Amino acid sequence: MKRTDSTAKATAPNPPLAPLLVILGNTGSGKSALALKLAREIPAGIVNADSRQIYSQMDIATAKPTPAEMSEIPHYLYSFIQPDQPFSLAEYQSLAYQAINKLHTQNRLPILVGGSGQYLKAVLEGWSIPQIAPDETFRAAMFEKAEKEGGASIFAELVKQDPQAAAKIDPRNIRRVVRALEVINKTGAEFSKLQTKNPPPYRVLKIGIHLAREELYRTVDLRVGKMLEQGLEAEVRHLLEQGYAATLPSMSGIGYRQIAKYIGGEISLSEAIEQMQFETHRLIRQQNTYFRLADPDIHWITLEESMDSGIINLVRNFLADGGKE
């Protein structure tokens, strides 16, 4: 019997999903170096997933790729907004999808690189993010309350209004707590109820670089000294002289906040260094809540393995499996 058109359509194979490579891990683990290594071997482009590397004029403490590296390989979402420019997670997600899709049209493999768990999850899980404009008056009031009464005071308010959201937000992340309260205040709905997921049509390979915690601590401690040698103090002074306030969200990043305090005479240089190292260690522990060794979706490798040719073969096989490359 002749098959109908509808039957033929029903049995037609689905088109192959577009590939996406993700390189993740702790700060200082060598993600950018691995991305560059792969992009030199396989037609690719690099998409930033680090919430600190989006800002222009803030290069040293954020450990961005160098201008030479960015001119050699296509890079997206680096240094594209000013330090005082508001920028939301929803905006990042939209721009990341645009960059990924653009690379696909160029027959390049998109490599999403970063250690900002929220950025990565928003893209990979397809979060539906509330499109709520910032309420600067509300934010100022919340930040003032946190300053006077401690961050626990506003986190307690979030626990009261939306316990599900509070369970997923680090109470030390004041900006995220304030954002959740802001959305609740403007919509009258629980923040957690407004976040749904619709994963994008990508075939994903996640590669994580793992270093033992003590080894990673030593690496980032040495990197703090190197940042100062590279001119971090001058970079922060230049930002302050241009009128960028030390209280800006962009200036809350590790390195900028502490050096701004040193420049302002609040702490000594040695205290600034100690605080930078302490905060980086804390960031590493926080990142470990996003990037778990037990996660079966992540192909974990050591730093030594990231330098080996085997990692290139892994990516080539991933592309070949989907009929890409």
UniProtKB/Swiss-Prot annotation:
Pfam families: IPPT (PF01715). Belongs to the IPP transferase family. It catalyses: adenosine(37) in tRNA + dimethylallyl diphosphate = N(6)-dimethylallyladenosine(37) in tRNA + diphosphate. Signal peptide: none annotated. This is tRNA dimethylallyltransferase. One of its GO terms (biological process) is tRNA modification. Monomer. Keywords: ATP-binding, Magnesium, Nucleotide-binding, Transferase, tRNA processing. Disulfide bonds: none annotated. Residues 50-53 are annotated as: Interaction with substrate tRNA. It comes from Dehalococcoides mccartyi (strain ATCC BAA-2266 / KCTC 15142 / 195). ATP binds at residues 25-32. Substrate binds at residues 27-32. Gene3D superfamilies: 1.10.20.140, P-loop containing nucleotide triphosphate hydrolases. The keyword Transport does not apply. Catalyzes the transfer of a dimethylallyl group onto the adenine at position 37 in tRNAs that read codons beginning with uridine, leading to the formation of N6-(dimethylallyl)adenosine (i(6)A). Its EC number is 2.5.1.75. GO terms for molecular function: ATP binding; tRNA dimethylallyltransferase activity. The record marks 116, 139 as: Interaction with substrate tRNA. The keyword Transferase applies. Its cofactor is Mg(2+).
